[in-house]
């Protein structure tokens, strides 16, 4: 897949404005358990991905989505709880 871009967040916010496919994410957890929720259509949009993260200030997780990626028709918004940072690869 060509034309990929990356975006790093350290708190809740917009990953990208406009349609995109998320192909990978890499996160660094916080000292207590947390979560990542990805929505299409802003903070109150439709949840397309949700995961819990265990406690661990040095915890890292790498998530690969399938070849098609996770499609966001409108935009991609991330709600982060107890996440130090998260990097998205999208295009």
Task: Annotate each language-model stretch with its function.
Residues 1-91:
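Surface-exposed, low-hydrophobicity beta-strand/loop segments enriched in small/polar/acidic residues
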């Amino acid at each position: 897949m060509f034309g990929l871009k990356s975006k790093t967040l350290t708190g809740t916010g917009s990953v990208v404005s406009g349609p995109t496919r998320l192909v990978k994410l890499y996160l660094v957890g916080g000292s207590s358990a947390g979560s990542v929720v990805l929505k299409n259509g802003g903070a109150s949009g439709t949840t397309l991905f949700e995961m819990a993260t265990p406690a661990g200030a040095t915890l890292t997780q790498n998530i690969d989505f399938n070849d098609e990626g996770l499609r966001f028709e409108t935009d991609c918004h991330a709600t982060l709880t107890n996440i130090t940072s998260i990097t998205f690869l999208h295009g």
